[in-house]
Regions:
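Catalytic machinery of carbohydrate-active enzymes
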Residues: 1-320
Length: 320
């Protein structure tokens, strides 16, 4: 049986989809698993033993009717038996329909029910994202201790050599940025949390975040902090993150990556988001003080309410 899965479009959500993929393989061990994903999340799925085929949508084909038709029709030669959509977009349902898949399974949202053959009941809004995906196959839990991201020996050797070249040992990964500006950690809070620390910090982020990373370094010039923003691909960053001592993370894709790899991860959340998108790794802790404000003022109060003591106690709890 050929089973296709339409991946979520964000790195964090892609990471949260990995338990779903593993459960599909457990349910159908002899099936061929095909992942359809955007280019910027493809690194999450590389070398996964449960994935037989990874089809990457080129960056230039993300939108438009012509591209949608082209992608959907190009999948017909795969003879897909079952197609799951882990994104709620209308476009994904059209692509599934055009693929000729016999069963097309997804939640009936955004008026796309016409293109789906099976429409499981939409779970409550406060169900965790990873469990929402599992609802598509009538599962309500998964084993968080399993491996979900896989690196080759060659990749890990590259990572160890790269860390050696950076002349760092036992470094701490720092992810202060997020796609949503409101989730980005305030500079003064970062300074408070790492003040007088003897750790070696590596800041991860995109090229557009490099200027902000330099500001963090300047504000803490007595500490060992190095910015890697924009210097490595997502896959390369993932390899380096897998070698860190622990990670301090905002509500971001990299935070989910470090957690699901198995790196001890402390994540900072606001506005009750940890309920739905908290990290799922066994060695992870979410600091969420969003209960302090009524009415909720989004992330203005809760992120700023997190103290150095909160961070230090979480580090002690999460480290082996």
């Amino acid at each position: 049986m050929n089973i296709a899965i339409y991946s979520p479009n964000w790195v964090g959500d892609a990471a949260l989809s990995l338990p779903f993929i593993s459960n599909i393989k457990l349910k159908h061990p002899d099936s061929k698993i095909i992942i359809l994903c955007k280019k910027w999340v493809s690194s999450v799925y590389l070398n996964h033993p449960d994935i037989d085929d990874l089809i990457v949508i080129p960056s230039g084909k993300n939108n438009g009717l012509v591209n949608t038709l082209s992608i959907g029709l190009s999948l017909r030669n795969l003879n897909i038996d079952v197609f799951y959509s882990l994104t709620d977009s209308f476009r994904s349902a059209i692509i599934m329909w055009l693929s000729g898949a016999i069963k097309r399974i997804g939640f009936n949202v955004q008026g796309r029910g016409l293109f789906l053959t099976h429409k499981p009941e939409l779970p409550p809004k406060k169900v965790h994202r990873s469990l929402k995906y599992l609802r598509l196959i009538n599962r309500t839990k998964f084993d968080s201790n399993g491996a979900f991201i896989f690196f080759t020996e060659k990749e890990l050797l590259w990572g160890k050599n790269e860390v050696k070249n950076l002349e760092l040992k036992d470094f701490v990964a720092l992810f202060p940025f997020s796609i949503a500006a409101a989730r980005t950690l305030p500079h003064e809070k970062i300074s408070e949390w790492i003040n007088e620390s003897n750790e070696n910090y590596l800041i991860f982020g995109s090229d557009k975040e490099s200027e902000e990373a330099e500001k963090i370094i300047k504000n803490n010039n007595d500490l060992s902090i190095t910015s890697l923003c924009g210097k490595y691909s997502l896959r390369e960053s993932m390899i380096l993150i897998s070698l860190c001592k622990y990670a301090l993370a905002t509500d971001s894709g990299l935070g989910h990556i470090s957690s699901i790899i198995g790196v001890p991860t402390i994540s900072f959340f606001g506005a009750n988001r940890s309920i739905v998108t908290g990290p799922i790794g066994e060695h992870s802790i979410s600091i969420d003080k969003s209960h302090r404000c009524k009415p909720c003022r989004k992330n203005i109060c809760c992120l700023r309410s997190i103290t150095k003591a909160d961070v230090n106690s979480s580090i002690i709890k999460v480290l082996p």
